Amino acid sequence: MVTEAQVVWVQKTLGVTRRAEPADGTTPTGGGAGDASGGGVFDDIKQFVVDLFTGKKAVKPADPVPRVELGKAQTDRADKLVAAMPKEDQSKVGELLEKAKPEEKKYLQKALASSHSAAELDAFYKQIAGKDKAWMDVNLHVVGDSKGQGVKQQWECSCGPTTIQAMKGELDPIYALKLRTDNPHLTEAKDDDATALNPNMAADQKAILVAHGGIATNRDTDGKGIALGGALNEQKGVTGLKFDTEDVPDDKFDARLAELDSALSGGLPVPIRVSSPGATGGHFVLVVGGELGPPRVYSIHDPWDGKIIKASEADIKAKKLNIAGWTQITHIYKPSADVPTVGS
């Protein structure tokens, strides 16, 4: 049994303590790790202590995330975008889809639905042709690798921008491959220097954060988060999705969960906001998969730790989550397709 004294000893040794999360309390904002009631860095300390004093892992690493199939929203958008292309480009895309293997074709269609040109699709096909499924599962996604790891927020309060990066990486394999190529340490972050490991990814996160009124600071310094709805909907031209911000009161829990299931079964990841009863702060994460069960279990990417967390319906309903110190879902950002009109 690990004692509180051992935890305190490690805190003093590492120079880390629990941290409070600032928020204005007027909009569903999100920032970094949990509030002063615990979680986040403090949970990492407890895990480290358990590993140090017992030689055992406190938490079993998450299994790799089952990849959702290409959904109707993206296939419909891909078809519409092809139809809007010049005839020469239509022929080029048709040839690519014809010669691609089934797994390659799926990713080509996802890239097409993400507004890439025929030339970009051709270059992408040359990068993935002949690659096996295991390679694609890692390199064409930015969450849920074989260790359950993925893209990590580089700034204290950039959970919203990082959730957007994770969402785009699940929808757009060209974006995912470039993000991985440009940021070989995207599952890591340096707490006292946000630009040390992944300067390109950090710059993108900061740009979204600052554009929406946030303040970018190193992970070990208090910053300011943002509301997510506007930043999500700015991606519509690329993703083809619009997002409705919906709260999750107790009397609408089942309805919101049904909406979540519907989106996931249609191949769409779902951003959500988590907080705790009585707290003003919060944290944005991305639901990337679900198992209908029973029991229903959801795979949630936490950008603070850069890891997949498994959450059961029972734990969600009982407000017993432990995501960066937060315990309940307060909002979901419901995606819906915005299919372009041919010729628009």
Regions found by a protein language model. Name each.
Residues 75, 90, 105, 118-121, ...:
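Alpha-helix initiation and N-capping motif
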Residues 2, 64, 68, 73-76, ...:
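Active-site nucleophile-adjacent alpha helix/oxyanion-hole segment immediately C-terminal to the catalytic cysteine
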Residues 17, 27, 32-36, 40-42, ...:
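Compositionally biased, intrinsically disordered low-complexity regions
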Residues 63-66, 73, 97, 124-127, ...:
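Conserved active-site-adjacent core of cysteine acyl-enzyme catalytic domains
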